[in-house]
Structures are given as structure tokens and as C-alpha cells.
Amino acid sequence: MIRYCLTSYREDLVILDIINDSFSIVPDAGSLLKERDKLLKEFPQLSYFFDSEYHIGSVSRNSDTSFLEERWFLPEPDKTLYKCSLFKRFILLLKVFYYSWNIEKKGMAWIFISNKKENRLYSLNEEHLIRKEISNLSIIFHLNIFKSDCLTYSYALKRILNSRNIDAHLVIGVRTQPFYSHSWVEVGGQVINDAPNMRDKLSVIAEI
């Protein structure tokens, strides 16, 4: 399993330690991320991270884009869609409890370990199904008694869509000065539960 995920934001290097569920920032090292020899020559203390299995993510397309740090808001349910039955809501809530409890207790490592690797295809006729599953999840998510944040919501949405044979990916983005991390879901390279230009605002440190 990958131990570290790395990316850069402006001049900063950001490291995600999956096992310890923590982020680290190394100022002025970001520009050397893709030049390993130069990076380790100038920052020899980073050799520890490169001796383990690691992944290098993508850099924000426009780090000058303003990004308002604010509390994450749960997506509003789509009132134009048919609401799922109470039984389905109950089953969905149990899944959310399971995902959020494990994320709260076991951290990022559990997400990587439990990630399913099946290859699935996406077609445009699945857009209605995606909208419906987002709406259904939003209806019950406020009842979650465990960790409720963008990571939990996005991971739950990814797993729900995967179970419907949709190749959804959890994406984790970061920025620095001040530090901020955020999670969203993409299908076919498109953001489905957040602003479409998230990759312009944040550097992607992990895709699951």
C-alpha cells in the first residue's frame, strides 16, 4: 500500500502520511518535487519519505485563484427527483454510519485499504442516477452521528456510486498559507458534488 502522497502548492511541498493520518508542509520545496535528486540534495531529510512507497499528485492549475476557506456545506437534496423509500434511506444511513465510524477511528489508511479496484465504465445516461444518489445521500447525511465532513460524505458517495457500477473517484485537494484540505468526487474526470473548477483552486494530493 502507498504510504505517502505528495504534491506542491505554490512553493510549498505537502505530504500526506496515510498511516498516521496527518499532513506535513515543507516550505520552499514544492518547485523541486519532480526533480528528486535536486530535492533530496537540498532537503536531505525528505529521503525518508521517498524510501517508502509514495504517490505524487497533480498541481493546481491556477494557484492564484482565490479560495474562500469556510465551513463545508452539505449539498442540498434535489427536490425534483423522486425520494427513495424509508427502507432504502435506513440502509443508506447504516452504510454512512459504517463508513464514517471507520474513517473516524482508523483514519485515511482505512480508506486506502478498503478501496475497491474494479474497472467500470461511465456513460452520459448515468447522469440522472448520479444526481439521484447525491440527493438521497444528502437527505440522510445530517443524521450521521460519527465524523461528518466533506471526506466522509465524498467517500460514502464514491462507494455508493461504485456499487451502482459507476467509476467514481474520491479526490483530496490541498492548499497552503493557510493550510486547507478538501475532498470531492469525480466521474469521468468531472466534479459531481462540488464546484467544477476544484483542480484550479487546489493541488490534488490523492485520488482513490
Swiss-Prot record:
User: Subcellular location, in the record's words?
Assistant: Cytoplasm
Q: Which UniProt keywords apply?
A: Antibiotic biosynthesis, Cytoplasm, Plasmid
- GO-annotated biological processes: antibiotic biosynthetic process
Highest rank taxon of the organism: Bacteria
Concerning InterPro entries, the annotation shows: McjB-like, McjB_C
Principal localisation: cytoplasm
- Provide the Gene Ontology terms for cellular component: cytoplasm
What role does this protein play?
Answer: Along with McjC, necessary and sufficient to process the inactive microcin J25 (McjA) precursor into the active peptide.
Name by which UniProt lists this protein: Microcin J25-processing protein McjB
**Organism annotation:** Escherichia coli
- State which gene encodes it: mcjB
